[in-house]
Amino acid sequence: MIQTQSTAIKRRNSVHKNLFDPSLYQIPEPPRGGFQHQKKEYSKETFSNQVFGYDITSLKKRFTQLFPSNIQGYLPEVDLRITIICSIWYVTSSISSNLSKAILRTFNHPIALTELQFLVSAVLCVGFASIVNLFRLPRLKHTKFSKALNSFPDGILPEYLDGNFRSSILHKFLVPSKLVLMTTFPMGIFQFIGHITSHKAVSMIPVSLVHSVKALSPIITVGYYKFFEHRYYNSMTYYTLLLLIFGVMTTCWSTHGSKRASDNKSGSSLIGLLFAFISMIIFVAQNIFAKNILTIRRKVGILPSSSTDDVTSKEGQPSLDKTRFSPLQVDKITILFYCSCIGFSLTLLPFLTGELMHGGSVINDLTLETVALVAIHGIAHFFQAMLAFQLIGLLSSINYSVANIMKRIVVISVALFWETKLNFFQVFGVILTIAGLYGYDKWGLSKKDGRQA
């Protein structure tokens, strides 16, 4: 009997099938398009743990040890990866914002500038994707430059780049799928309206005043999540955001006050403020809409799927009533390319029927110097958009709005030093803004529900 029982046990072990194993009932997923995304075979450095060859944890520890022990407890927690991305984002944004104002002084055609900006961005996307695809060839993929390209965070580059230009670029990257069009068409509309209104505002009022209006975006974002999504925020969130907004507006209005006598065009200023406000609303709407699309973490996706992830309950049994979502996300190069193409297409009709037909000076004003500035502006905008997409996926909507406020402070500070005009109220406004950012990071959104925004 003992031998028979052990034999039966061996037979059951040889079958080794659990009736509650969800893999028994898994239905093969249908193809998600004309091609199947495949996993990368390239060795890729973990960007979240390494920055320029240094370990993030050791760098943070060394930096903290520079301060006395009684001060270390008051230091805010710093994510070095996000700090580096934000720093580069601030530099490129400063270049882009100040160049747009410089271009519009001699080339006062906001719609034409928007059209050229979309065109340069689309060309850069195709060129960058082609270079990455080239260095996926077997003879080039082990070079240092190829390893640097492969160290980009997840979600930046397409997964299907394999070195074959015809299949990867011509047949996949340049041929949009239904998913890509569903994702990028609404964002292209946001880009179209946002860029035109922003350039219109910059052409009518100072850059500082445009950014002071856009500084209201965190308040609008918090209001949306509170009244429409029923999110909870503690009182410190509102206090720190108000301090933040007050600091930004103090800096901007103190800069604008010195120009009020020379630029006293009430009608033009009012229209410029209206364009800036519309641009701010578009920014908030795009931020909220793009959050679920640009987030790389495995959470709710944009398409339903029969993926086997998270399909079992705690007891190990298959869950039939649990909603499952697709982990499929569109990479940021593809999003930026098709957003630029859609924005270019939508801007083409207003450009042809407006500035080109009725303002015949567009071609005459497009000098060689203007073309060079537009090219530099387009390159800076390309990197700015890529970094913004990456930050939207890494940060919450409120944190991204605050990072965007800090970006505006850097832009305004660069403009102030560029114009060599600095007064007490501008410095006071910058200090208030930094204090608001510190307070928001230290005490704001302390509740778990608030962190999920």
From Swiss-Prot:
Main location: membrane
Cytoplasmic topological segments: 1-110, 194-201, 256-269, 354-371, 435-453
Lumenal side: 132-172, 223-234, 291-332, 393-413
Pfam families, per database record: TPT (PF03151)
Membrane topology qualifier: Multi-pass membrane protein
Record-annotated membrane-spanning stretches: 111-131, 173-193, 202-222, 235-255, 270-290, 333-353, 372-392, 414-434
Highest taxon above the source species: Eukaryota
An annotated GO BP: phosphoenolpyruvate transmembrane import into Golgi lumen
GO cellular component: endoplasmic reticulum; Golgi apparatus; membrane
Miscellaneous section: Present with 784 molecules/cell in log phase SD medium.
Family: Belongs to the TPT transporter family.
Database matches in PANTHER family: SOLUTE CARRIER FAMILY 35 (PTHR11132)
Designated name of the protein: Uncharacterized transporter SLY41
Native species: Saccharomyces cerevisiae (strain ATCC 204508 / S288c) (Baker's yeast)
Origin organism lineage: Eukaryota, Fungi, Dikarya, Ascomycota, Saccharomycotina
